[in-house]
Design a protein with these regions (language model features):
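Conserved catalytic alpha/beta core of Sir2/sirtuin-type deacylases, generalized to analogous enzyme cores
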Residues: 1-172
Length: 172
């Protein structure tokens, strides 16, 4: 949607890293070049024995989206979707925290800030970094941080974010 494409447009001016809890590939399809998936990726299959080993991942395609019962990964274990199930560790959380710790601008889109551990990433934002939250719903924000809240749907909020970050931009 326009929100995804708007984030891609920001890559022309900023070093953008997307950290997402979504398991779809919409950011990649829109053209984002650096995406960290906290909860895995629906279009990847992995080893049930070693799910976080990218050498054992298989990329699924629209032509081949099913994993059949009994299908094996390269290490001989059962093949499974590369999705973080309830109760499993979030393998990319440390990588995400390191990226957040380098941010000059941190943008939260479509989050209640209630789902942990992802909601805790805001604690890693450096002092002095600008923080924006885009969500049409009222969200309780941490009182110890200055957060600019844009109560808008994602597409409209990203457009407004671009206006604020790139006031001279004429592509809006």
């Amino acid at each position: 949607n326009e929100g995804h494409r708007g984030l891609v447009a920001l890559e022309n001016q900023f070093d953008v890293t997307i950290v997402t809890q979504n398991v779809d590939d919409l950011h990649e399809r829109a053209g984002s070049s650096h995406v960290i998936h906290l909860h895995g990726e629906l279009m990847k299959a992995c080893s049930s024995r070693d799910p976080d080993n990218p050498r054992l991942w298989q990329t699924l395609t629209p032509e081949r989206v099913e994993i059949h019962p009994g299908e094996l990964a390269a290490d001989g274990s059962l093949l499974r979707p590369w999705i973080v199930w309830f109760g499993e560790a979030v393998p990319n959380l440390e990588q995400a925290a390191k990226e957040v710790a380098k941010a000059d601008i941190f943008v939260i889109i479509g989050s209640s800030l209630n789902v942990y551990p992802a909601a805790g990433l805001v604690r890693h934002v450096p002092d002095g970094a600008k923080i924006f939250l885009i969500d049409p719903a009222e969200v309780r924000v941490p009182s110890n941080r200055a957060i600019t809240v844009l109560r808008l749907p994602a597409s409209e909020g990203v457009k407004e974010l671009r206006r604020r970050l790139l006031p001279e931009s004429e592509s809006l």
